[in-house]
């Protein structure tokens, strides 16, 4: 009070007022504050008083030659006085106007190339449609979103190297461009930016926008792909939203979307194979998305989705430390727990062994359509605050939280037996058994949970067992909030391990992910996904399996032929024949296999019965475990197009049609490729011509190793001996001639000698 009184007295004296308003500031501390460092302390004020001056801009001396002293209106454009402390000229803002109107022009051809991201944004906005504005409460939650549409996915370091290579190619410094994408981009950009006059720094900035994904942690309600985020300020406010449809798609969003679909398909397929982890890796390495190897995309793309993260873990990449349960991402924010096995009884008196988490913990739960905060103790839910788009989404979150809490009343609410299995027909673990059970029907769970009266808290209401809102009562411990729960913002990645069955654990041994968590949602990928692995042939149905199997045999016929005659068992066990088995009626599989294997053995034993087309046609049937029986078949059935189709043992059918004239194979009307060698009998002439320069010594001699194909003979050195597979599956021993003069006689004698050697 004393001080205020003192100040009032001071202010009443006219001298004080004069000092404060009229005199210059000469206090050292104040002068220091505003003059130390290069950083402007009050930019707005500085701008105002600068622009009030006549010549607020400084320019290089050369400006005096390039700009007249006065403009058409006779206003002065620059002052003859030098800028204090430098040898630059003081220039009026009018000079800028003059320059813009009358200054030199330059080629604009590079602008759309350098400012590509801006030009594309304008196009998207031009073709986008803005709908009506709705006023309603916006449940926004902060999510990590992609800010700049149309970027490649290089790491900051990779991009830096590319930018240096393109913009400053002559700068010193070690730069090694390793990845495929780096090399392609560098080549493309160098070509585009030849003779570009835009300042290199600007070009570098713009390239960075194009090459690196920029993410921000922003409050979003609605679409999270980058083409929505770029108009976030136009589409959602605190209490309003504007409908918007983007006027174009960008590759980075398409890559994210297609990557998720590919990863889900691969995880689902791997789950049902004999060695899920090995199969998953094989598929990831042989799959391309939009022409880029999936493993390259996985290394660079930060998308966090269950299937994508399982693939990353398998490749030894780090992933987020949050874990997944029931399609929600859980992140522990407080507390800790220890795990202990406990046996519990369901309402149906079935015993379940569950891993109980003992201790107090708090979690955030984030799903696509609902979010929640969960506080729990050992086998007890203390509080669940949930928010979601609609009743259905809120119910989903409540079920997941109730199961996760492991409360006794939840386990006692089970009616009937729990026997859910995964795609590979293995029983699910108890927690997922419970989850599936209540996801099917949660009525009993909600009825048995119990309700409690609630206090009136701002922004929170109760929810009843039938999922209707209430201000008086609510499910015990559960409240519905208007506010969403933010996604976990950290981008920290941790080292994880993965087991054979694709369960991903952190270094403390907690399971973060498992195939049960992979969504069953099917979507159409935006970019072409090319699965080269035979395990993915099934994805497009039985027809594709049939066509792909025969295409594979034809493509690899050279090696298949040798294996057929020498190591048939190895050939029958090839994984490429696995998908085919699902087409053969279960009851007939082993009978067909026994029949075909016997037939093949006869072909190997009896001269001249080798028939290329027939071997190709019947080979996939021999892959099943055979049953030794005397059964003969004139046709074999495959289940395609919803019914059984016959493949004739001798002759053509719609399911397998070989045209002798064109030498092409057609499967169900689709071209499956051409046979490069002549599959007709008695074509010894061809071989004798090829065998010129070789002396035929006699029957096959095992000491000289496995049989070579005719194409491989050229690798022999003079005088070297080898077994060679000729004609229709017969093997003879040959030696490469030491002299070239006798080559002519070879073709006549070859034919005779082949006959002798075989007989």
From Swiss-Prot:
Keyword Nucleotidyltransferase in record: no
UniProt gene name: PB2
Position of the signal peptide: none
GO CC annotation, single: host cell nucleus
Protein name (database record): Polymerase basic protein 2
Residue numbers covered by motif Nuclear localization signal: 736-739
UniProt record similarity statement: Belongs to the influenza viruses PB2 family.
Pfam families in the cross-refs: Flu_PB2_1st (PF20947), Flu_PB2_2nd (PF20948), Flu_PB2_3rd (PF20949), Flu_PB2_4th (PF20950), Flu_PB2_5th (PF00604), Flu_PB2_6th (PF20951), Flu_PB2_7th (PF20952)
GO biological process, one term: viral RNA genome replication
Keyword Secreted: no
Site positions per UniProt: Avian adaptation: 627
Keywords, alphabetical: Cap snatching, Eukaryotic host gene expression shutoff by virus, Eukaryotic host transcription shutoff by virus, Host gene expression shutoff by virus, Host nucleus, Host-virus interaction, Inhibition of host RNA polymerase II by virus, mRNA capping, mRNA processing, Viral transcription, Virion
GO MF entries: RNA binding; RNA-directed RNA polymerase activity
Function recorded in the entry: Plays an essential role in transcription initiation and cap-stealing mechanism, in which cellular capped pre-mRNAs are used to generate primers for viral transcription. Recognizes and binds the 7-methylguanosine-containing cap of the target pre-RNA which is subsequently cleaved after 10-13 nucleotides by the viral protein PA. Plays a role in the initiation of the viral genome replication and modulates the activity of the ribonucleoprotein (RNP) complex.
InterPro entries per record: Flu_PB2_2nd, Flu_PB2_6th, Flu_PB2_C, Flu_PB2_CAP-bd, Flu_PB2_middle, Flu_PB2_N, INV_PB2, PB2_helical
